[in-house]
Protein backbone atom coordinates (compact mmCIF):
# COMPACT_ATOMS: atom_id res chain seq x y z
CA UNK A 1 0.00 0.00 0.00
CA UNK A 2 1.20 3.49 -0.82
CA UNK A 3 -0.46 5.36 2.05
CA UNK A 4 -3.22 5.00 4.65
CA UNK A 5 -5.53 7.94 5.36
CA UNK A 6 -6.92 7.91 8.90
CA UNK A 7 -10.19 9.72 9.69
CA UNK A 8 -10.26 11.36 13.11
CA UNK A 9 -12.33 13.70 15.23
CA UNK A 10 -10.64 17.01 16.11
CA UNK A 11 -10.41 16.81 19.90
CA UNK A 12 -7.04 16.46 21.63
CA UNK A 13 -7.92 12.97 22.85
CA UNK A 14 -9.12 11.83 19.42
CA UNK A 15 -5.90 13.12 17.85
CA UNK A 16 -3.79 11.43 20.54
CA UNK A 17 -5.49 8.14 19.73
CA UNK A 18 -5.16 8.64 15.98
CA UNK A 19 -1.49 9.58 16.22
CA UNK A 20 -0.91 6.51 18.39
CA UNK A 21 -2.35 4.32 15.60
CA UNK A 22 -0.52 6.29 12.89
CA UNK A 23 2.83 5.74 14.65
CA UNK A 24 2.19 2.02 15.07
CA UNK A 25 1.22 1.58 11.40
CA UNK A 26 4.27 3.50 10.20
CA UNK A 27 6.76 1.78 12.51
CA UNK A 28 5.37 -1.77 12.55
CA UNK A 29 3.76 -2.08 9.11
CA UNK A 30 6.08 0.35 7.33
CA UNK A 31 3.17 2.12 5.60
CA UNK A 32 3.06 5.96 5.54
CA UNK A 33 -0.07 7.57 7.00
CA UNK A 34 -1.87 10.89 6.92
CA UNK A 35 -4.62 12.11 9.23
CA UNK A 36 -7.85 13.70 8.00
CA UNK A 37 -9.73 15.51 10.79
CA UNK A 38 -13.43 16.32 10.84
CA UNK A 39 -16.16 17.46 13.22
CA UNK A 40 -18.95 15.01 14.01
CA UNK A 41 -22.51 15.81 15.09
CA UNK A 42 -21.57 14.55 18.56
CA UNK A 43 -18.89 17.26 18.75
CA UNK A 44 -21.20 20.01 17.51
CA UNK A 45 -24.38 19.40 19.56
CA UNK A 46 -23.23 19.98 23.13
CA UNK A 47 -26.30 21.44 24.80
CA UNK A 48 -28.25 18.17 25.03
CA UNK A 49 -27.54 14.74 26.57
CA UNK A 50 -26.35 12.14 24.03
CA UNK A 51 -29.26 9.82 24.78
CA UNK A 52 -31.65 12.57 23.59
CA UNK A 53 -29.95 13.32 20.26
CA UNK A 54 -29.16 9.94 18.74
CA UNK A 55 -26.52 8.27 20.88
CA UNK A 56 -22.96 7.16 20.30
CA UNK A 57 -23.21 6.83 16.51
CA UNK A 58 -23.15 10.65 16.35
CA UNK A 59 -19.39 10.49 16.96
CA UNK A 60 -18.82 8.16 14.00
CA UNK A 61 -21.08 8.93 11.04
CA UNK A 62 -18.91 11.59 9.37
CA UNK A 63 -15.84 9.36 9.67
CA UNK A 64 -17.71 6.44 8.11
CA UNK A 65 -18.97 8.63 5.25
CA UNK A 66 -15.33 9.61 4.58
CA UNK A 67 -14.39 5.92 4.32
CA UNK A 68 -17.31 5.09 2.03
CA UNK A 69 -16.41 7.99 -0.28
CA UNK A 70 -12.73 6.90 -0.41
CA UNK A 71 -11.55 10.01 1.47
CA UNK A 72 -10.23 7.82 4.30
CA UNK A 73 -9.17 4.18 4.67
CA UNK A 74 -9.71 3.68 8.40
CA UNK A 75 -11.11 5.54 11.41
CA UNK A 76 -9.96 5.49 15.03
CA UNK A 77 -12.36 5.47 18.00
CA UNK A 78 -12.61 5.00 21.74
CA UNK A 79 -14.38 1.64 21.88
CA UNK A 80 -16.79 2.91 24.54
CA UNK A 81 -18.15 5.34 21.90
CA UNK A 82 -18.78 2.57 19.35
CA UNK A 83 -22.37 1.18 19.23
CA UNK A 84 -22.73 -2.60 19.49
CA UNK A 85 -24.06 -2.70 15.94
CA UNK A 86 -21.97 -1.12 13.17
CA UNK A 87 -23.48 0.04 9.86
CA UNK A 88 -23.46 -2.61 7.14
CA UNK A 89 -20.07 -3.00 5.49
CA UNK A 90 -17.98 -1.83 8.46
CA UNK A 91 -15.96 -3.84 10.98
CA UNK A 92 -13.61 -3.39 13.92
CA UNK A 93 -10.24 -4.36 12.49
CA UNK A 94 -7.84 -3.89 15.40
CA UNK A 95 -8.06 -3.58 19.19
CA UNK A 96 -5.24 -1.81 21.04
CA UNK A 97 -3.94 -2.71 24.53
CA UNK A 98 -6.32 -1.47 27.21
CA UNK A 99 -5.51 1.57 29.35
CA UNK A 100 -6.91 1.82 32.90
CA UNK A 101 -10.65 1.12 32.42
CA UNK A 102 -11.88 2.75 35.63
CA UNK A 103 -13.89 5.94 35.97
CA UNK A 104 -12.04 8.89 37.48
CA UNK A 105 -13.32 11.17 40.25
CA UNK A 106 -11.95 14.67 39.63
CA UNK A 107 -12.34 17.47 42.17
CA UNK A 108 -10.43 20.52 43.37
CA UNK A 109 -12.01 20.39 46.83
CA UNK A 110 -12.69 16.77 47.77
CA UNK A 111 -10.46 13.67 47.82
CA UNK A 112 -13.06 11.02 47.01
CA UNK A 113 -16.76 10.35 46.46
CA UNK A 114 -17.04 9.57 50.17
CA UNK A 115 -15.72 13.05 51.03
CA UNK A 116 -18.45 14.89 49.12
CA UNK A 117 -20.93 16.73 51.35
CA UNK A 118 -24.65 16.12 51.06
CA UNK A 119 -26.10 17.92 48.03
CA UNK A 120 -22.72 18.26 46.27
CA UNK A 121 -23.02 18.89 42.51
CA UNK A 122 -21.34 16.24 40.34
CA UNK A 123 -21.03 16.56 36.56
CA UNK A 124 -21.55 13.68 34.15
CA UNK A 125 -23.81 13.05 31.16
CA UNK A 126 -23.39 9.27 31.33
CA UNK A 127 -26.53 7.50 32.55
CA UNK A 128 -24.32 4.59 33.65
CA UNK A 129 -22.17 6.84 35.86
CA UNK A 130 -25.17 8.78 37.14
CA UNK A 131 -27.11 5.65 38.14
CA UNK A 132 -24.17 4.02 39.93
CA UNK A 133 -23.21 7.25 41.68
CA UNK A 134 -26.77 7.80 42.93
CA UNK A 135 -26.98 4.17 44.03
CA UNK A 136 -23.85 4.71 46.13
CA UNK A 137 -24.68 8.26 47.25
CA UNK A 138 -28.34 9.16 46.76
CA UNK A 139 -27.78 12.54 48.45
CA UNK A 140 -25.75 13.95 45.54
CA UNK A 141 -27.01 16.23 42.76
CA UNK A 142 -25.99 15.01 39.30
CA UNK A 143 -25.92 17.58 36.48
CA UNK A 144 -25.25 17.07 32.78
CA UNK A 145 -21.74 17.74 31.51
CA UNK A 146 -20.86 17.52 27.81
CA UNK A 147 -17.81 18.56 25.78
CA UNK A 148 -14.22 17.42 25.40
CA UNK A 149 -11.95 16.76 28.39
CA UNK A 150 -10.52 20.30 28.46
CA UNK A 151 -14.02 21.84 28.35
CA UNK A 152 -15.20 19.62 31.20
CA UNK A 153 -12.15 20.38 33.34
CA UNK A 154 -12.55 24.13 32.78
CA UNK A 155 -16.20 23.94 33.90
CA UNK A 156 -15.03 22.22 37.08
CA UNK A 157 -12.27 24.81 37.59
CA UNK A 158 -14.79 27.64 37.08
CA UNK A 159 -16.79 26.32 40.03
CA UNK A 160 -19.78 24.97 38.08
CA UNK A 161 -19.40 21.59 39.81
CA UNK A 162 -17.97 20.24 43.07
CA UNK A 163 -16.63 17.23 41.16
CA UNK A 164 -16.86 15.60 37.74
CA UNK A 165 -16.56 12.00 36.55
CA UNK A 166 -14.40 11.19 33.50
CA UNK A 167 -12.74 8.11 32.02
CA UNK A 168 -9.31 7.59 33.59
CA UNK A 169 -7.91 6.43 30.24
CA UNK A 170 -8.44 9.80 28.52
CA UNK A 171 -6.79 11.73 31.34
CA UNK A 172 -3.82 9.34 31.41
CA UNK A 173 -3.34 9.58 27.63
CA UNK A 174 -3.39 13.37 27.71
CA UNK A 175 -0.87 13.38 30.58
CA UNK A 176 -3.47 14.79 32.96
CA UNK A 177 -3.27 11.94 35.46
CA UNK A 178 -2.51 14.44 38.24
CA UNK A 179 -6.11 15.70 37.86
CA UNK A 180 -7.44 12.32 38.99
CA UNK A 181 -8.37 12.63 42.66
CA UNK A 182 -9.66 9.05 42.94
CA UNK A 183 -9.69 6.04 40.64
CA UNK A 184 -13.24 4.87 41.33
CA UNK A 185 -13.30 1.15 42.26
CA UNK A 186 -15.24 -1.03 39.80
CA UNK A 187 -17.34 -2.18 42.77
CA UNK A 188 -18.75 1.36 42.95
CA UNK A 189 -18.76 2.27 39.24
CA UNK A 190 -18.48 -0.55 36.73
CA UNK A 191 -16.89 0.82 33.51
CA UNK A 192 -18.62 1.28 30.18
CA UNK A 193 -18.37 -1.49 27.61
CA UNK A 194 -14.94 -1.19 25.96
CA UNK A 195 -13.75 1.67 28.18
CA UNK A 196 -9.98 2.24 27.86
CA UNK A 197 -9.62 0.47 24.49
CA UNK A 198 -8.79 2.26 21.22
CA UNK A 199 -10.08 0.53 18.06
CA UNK A 200 -9.56 0.77 14.32
CA UNK A 201 -12.69 0.73 12.15
CA UNK A 202 -12.40 -0.31 8.50
CA UNK A 203 -14.49 -1.46 5.56
CA UNK A 204 -15.16 -5.21 5.39
CA UNK A 205 -14.44 -5.23 1.66
CA UNK A 206 -10.86 -4.01 2.12
CA UNK A 207 -9.28 -7.44 2.63
CA UNK A 208 -5.69 -6.38 1.98
CA UNK A 209 -5.88 -3.58 4.56
CA UNK A 210 -7.69 -5.77 7.11
CA UNK A 211 -4.95 -8.38 6.87
CA UNK A 212 -2.29 -5.76 7.58
CA UNK A 213 -4.17 -4.07 10.45
CA UNK A 214 -4.74 -7.45 12.10
CA UNK A 215 -1.00 -7.57 12.85
CA UNK A 216 -1.51 -4.69 15.32
CA UNK A 217 -4.35 -6.45 17.15
CA UNK A 218 -4.03 -7.09 20.91
CA UNK A 219 -5.55 -10.52 21.55
CA UNK A 220 -6.39 -9.80 25.20
CA UNK A 221 -8.21 -6.55 24.37
CA UNK A 222 -10.03 -8.26 21.52
CA UNK A 223 -11.27 -11.10 23.75
CA UNK A 224 -12.43 -8.99 26.69
CA UNK A 225 -14.04 -6.41 24.38
CA UNK A 226 -15.88 -9.16 22.49
CA UNK A 227 -17.35 -10.47 25.76
CA UNK A 228 -18.42 -7.01 26.91
CA UNK A 229 -19.92 -6.11 23.53
CA UNK A 230 -21.73 -9.46 23.22
CA UNK A 231 -23.36 -8.77 26.59
CA UNK A 232 -24.37 -5.28 25.46
CA UNK A 233 -25.70 -6.53 22.13
CA UNK A 234 -27.84 -9.23 23.75
CA UNK A 235 -29.34 -6.55 26.02
CA UNK A 236 -29.60 -4.12 23.08
CA UNK A 237 -27.99 -1.43 25.23
CA UNK A 238 -26.99 2.04 24.12
CA UNK A 239 -26.24 5.32 25.86
CA UNK A 240 -29.97 5.73 26.67
CA UNK A 241 -29.74 3.05 29.38
CA UNK A 242 -27.50 2.47 32.41
CA UNK A 243 -25.40 -0.57 31.48
CA UNK A 244 -21.84 -1.41 32.50
CA UNK A 245 -19.66 -4.40 31.67
CA UNK A 246 -16.03 -5.19 32.38
CA UNK A 247 -14.10 -8.35 31.54
CA UNK A 248 -10.70 -9.56 32.72
CA UNK A 249 -8.60 -12.31 31.15
CA UNK A 250 -6.62 -14.79 33.25
CA UNK A 251 -4.85 -17.40 31.11
CA UNK A 252 -7.73 -18.34 28.82
CA UNK A 253 -10.52 -17.74 31.34
CA UNK A 254 -12.61 -14.59 31.02
CA UNK A 255 -14.35 -13.15 34.08
CA UNK A 256 -17.19 -10.88 32.94
CA UNK A 257 -18.83 -8.50 35.43
CA UNK A 258 -21.98 -6.67 34.39
CA UNK A 259 -24.48 -4.19 35.76
CA UNK A 260 -27.84 -2.73 34.79
CA UNK A 261 -29.56 0.02 36.76
CA UNK A 262 -32.56 2.29 36.72
CA UNK A 263 -31.64 5.85 35.76
CA UNK A 264 -32.22 7.08 39.33
CA UNK A 265 -29.94 4.36 40.75
CA UNK A 266 -32.65 2.99 43.04
CA UNK A 267 -32.71 -0.41 41.33
CA UNK A 268 -29.47 -2.11 40.37
CA UNK A 269 -28.58 -5.64 39.29
CA UNK A 270 -25.01 -6.94 39.22
CA UNK A 271 -23.78 -10.36 38.15
CA UNK A 272 -20.58 -12.02 37.02
CA UNK A 273 -19.79 -15.14 35.02
CA UNK A 274 -16.64 -17.00 33.96
CA UNK A 275 -16.05 -18.71 30.61
CA UNK A 276 -13.58 -19.14 27.75
CA UNK A 277 -15.75 -18.23 24.73
CA UNK A 278 -16.19 -14.42 24.83
CA UNK A 279 -19.28 -14.19 22.61
CA UNK A 280 -21.05 -17.06 24.33
CA UNK A 281 -20.12 -15.70 27.76
CA UNK A 282 -21.51 -12.24 27.03
CA UNK A 283 -24.78 -13.65 25.68
CA UNK A 284 -25.24 -16.09 28.58
CA UNK A 285 -24.67 -13.43 31.23
CA UNK A 286 -27.11 -11.08 29.49
CA UNK A 287 -29.72 -13.85 29.29
CA UNK A 288 -29.26 -14.63 33.00
CA UNK A 289 -29.76 -10.97 33.88
CA UNK A 290 -32.79 -10.67 31.58
CA UNK A 291 -34.31 -13.64 33.43
CA UNK A 292 -33.66 -11.77 36.69
CA UNK A 293 -35.55 -8.70 35.46
CA UNK A 294 -32.89 -6.59 33.70
CA UNK A 295 -35.35 -5.12 31.20
CA UNK A 296 -37.78 -4.03 33.93
CA UNK A 297 -34.93 -2.30 35.76
CA UNK A 298 -33.70 -0.53 32.61
CA UNK A 299 -37.22 0.66 31.77
CA UNK A 300 -37.78 2.14 35.23
Curated annotation (Swiss-Prot):
GO terms for molecular function: hydroxymethylbilane synthase activity. GO terms for biological process: protoporphyrinogen IX biosynthetic process. It is an enzyme of class 2 (transferase). Coiled coil: none annotated. The modification S-(dipyrrolylmethanemethyl)cysteine is found at residue 239. The keyword Iron-sulfur does not apply. It comes from the Bacteria. Its cofactor is dipyrromethane. Monomer. Belongs to the HMBS family. HAMAP family: Porphobil_deam. This is Porphobilinogen deaminase. It comes from Francisella tularensis subsp. tularensis (strain WY96-3418). The lineage of its organism: Bacteria, Pseudomonadati, Pseudomonadota, Gammaproteobacteria, Thiotrichales.
Amino acid sequence: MKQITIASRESKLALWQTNFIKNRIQSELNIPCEISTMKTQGDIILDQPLNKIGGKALFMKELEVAMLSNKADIAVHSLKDVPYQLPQGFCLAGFMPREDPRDAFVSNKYNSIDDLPKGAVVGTSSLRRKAQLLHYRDDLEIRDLRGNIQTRLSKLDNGDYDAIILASAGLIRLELVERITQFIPVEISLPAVGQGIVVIEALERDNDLLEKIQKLNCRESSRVATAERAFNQELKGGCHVAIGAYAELDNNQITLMAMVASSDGKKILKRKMIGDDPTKLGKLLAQEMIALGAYKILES
